[in-house]
Amino acid sequence: VEEWIIRDEASILNQLGFKVSDFVEQRISDGTFKKNDLEFTKNSFVQKNIMTECENIYAKTYKDSIINLIEDKFSFEKKVYERSAQLYWFGGELINTVENIYEKWNLFLSCFKILKCEVSNSIALDQNNMRPRAALRWRLICLHNSNGFFGLPTNKEIEIYGISHAEFGKEGIVREFILIDEISIWKQLLL
């Protein structure tokens, strides 16, 4: 049995009134975060064998959607979300409507040149009286090469770890949860 235990530390920090980047800078200056921590972070992503009994059309659709969304940087030819979709974004943010969802993804991705996108785990479930749903664990290897959400470009190669959960309606995703380790991103940029 594999269990993913996670929490949105960026959301906790935001609720306490801290900026994530300031928190990481403080932890670097007090010696809590060290450069050798990065090697552990970068070696922690292991691709697992896909459990075929947990894979179905929704897992494949979601996996393809996320990869296309990230790699194609929003050539919106393929419809991924229903018009009234909701996105629960890392940091405790709730985004409503498909236009705002694409804008949020674009803002996040615009400061990176994506070098590699891979999914290590996918699982899906389709039960009576519930919306079909799927979950993914994924990683991006990218170059921080543009201004944006993560400040001025550092030209550092970083790894971004994420998990996603989606619920599907008749025309696409109706509700999605995205959790990204924002503290890890800032550590890689600032150390």
Feature map (PLM): residue ranges:
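C-terminal and inter-domain tail/linker signature
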Residues: 1-191
